[in-house]
Amino acid sequence: MSIKTVKDFSSFAGKRALVRCDFNVPLKEGSISDDTRIRAALSTIEYLKERGARIVLVSHLGRPDGKKNSKYSLKPVANRLSELLGQDVKMLSDCIGSEVVNSTLQMKDGDVVLLENVRFYAEEEKNDKNFAKKLSENGDVFVNDAFGAAHRAHASTVGVADYLPSVGGFLMEKEDKFLGGILKNPERPFVSIIGGSKVSSKIAVLESLLSKSNVVVIGGGMAYTFLHSEGYSIGKSLLEDEYIGIASSFLKKAKELGVKVILPLDHIVADDFNKNSIPEYINSFNIPENKIGMDIGANTLKEIEKVVKTAKTIIWNGPLGVFEFDSFSKGTAKVAEMVASCSGLTVVGGGDSVAAVNKFNLSDKITHVSTGGGASLEYLEGRILPGIKVLEN
């Protein structure tokens, strides 16, 4: 089902648009270390400005546990937005209350203000009706552009929609289009590349994508549980005992469906899990008993390259090795390059794989880099996201 977007709203002129963004950006000593999420909101903000809206931005930042805490103030975001938009973005000292409402009522067309962190109130995460109503008094129309928080049924993502006409912003529309398109009708061959450390956090995504994929590539720490389930020795590598049976059932089901599964057939290993460990190549499915699997090997990469070259659609979620350690990042880097050079539709979702694509400066060569970590994952699991549901036609 498609969502209503800003393009479906008749007129923004003179109206206060309460825009829920995802400005949950990383801060280092009070400075923003990565402004990707702020830039992602600009197209919606510019669109509303051009149409004479009075823009009231709302977001969370970090986990202040329902208490005011200057460490989690959105002030650095207001400063960065002022630079990016080339106009003063006024930072308000709160997100609800008569003083805040009066400030929004005195705005002129094209003005932009930012409310203080909604998570300074415990009621936000409880989706408290009274809090949502107070928040809604800052707008005449609600625009949700916070895909990264769409899997949370909070007051600022879901609750306010009970009190205001509600539409999605361009970022929300884009995420819904690309991730939804992959689940509904992918062009084939469709290759799913799923990495990450734990089967427990990725099995739902794997099961959701299995029936839709032609090929599933499994890498990262979770691959060792799959290898173990097939009878291979994995040394001291990560193993989730309670998921061995589930991994085995998954591989059996893939066989029944005629879906090719690529598991690591060679490895880069180390004596221990340490960034300074010496990498060693093992040309076998089996890992010696005193070694830990840390990355995929050259033969595995060749197998992946074969399927990526001919793919018409690729979804990649999760790194294929311990990419945060430089000595064990080559597998993930090579896969990032392969995905970037694929001529088909490519979507990268999930925090770590997005970080990998950014680390290797390849994001502009990917069709769509998802901004939602947990939200992307839940969407790909086939779950209904509350923040999207309230925007459906």
UniProtKB/Swiss-Prot annotation:
Pathway: Carbohydrate degradation; glycolysis; pyruvate from D-glyceraldehyde 3-phosphate: step 2/5. It catalyses: (2R)-3-phosphoglycerate + ATP = (2R)-3-phospho-glyceroyl phosphate + ADP. Signal peptide: none annotated. It comes from the Bacteria. ATP binds at residues 202, 293, 324, 350-353. Substrate binds at residues 22-24, 37, 60-63, 119, 152. Keywords: ATP-binding, Cytoplasm, Glycolysis, Kinase, Nucleotide-binding, Transferase. Its main location: cytoplasm. GO terms for biological process: gluconeogenesis; glycolytic process. GO terms for molecular function: ADP binding; ATP binding; phosphoglycerate kinase activity. Its EC number is 2.7.2.3. One of its GO terms (cellular component) is cytosol. It is found in: Cytoplasm. InterPro entries: Phosphoglycerate_kinase, Phosphoglycerate_kinase_N, Phosphoglycerate_kinase_sf. Gene3D superfamilies: Phosphoglycerate kinase, N-terminal domain. Pfam families: PGK (PF00162). Belongs to the phosphoglycerate kinase family. Monomer. This is Phosphoglycerate kinase. It comes from Borreliella burgdorferi (strain ZS7) (Borrelia burgdorferi).
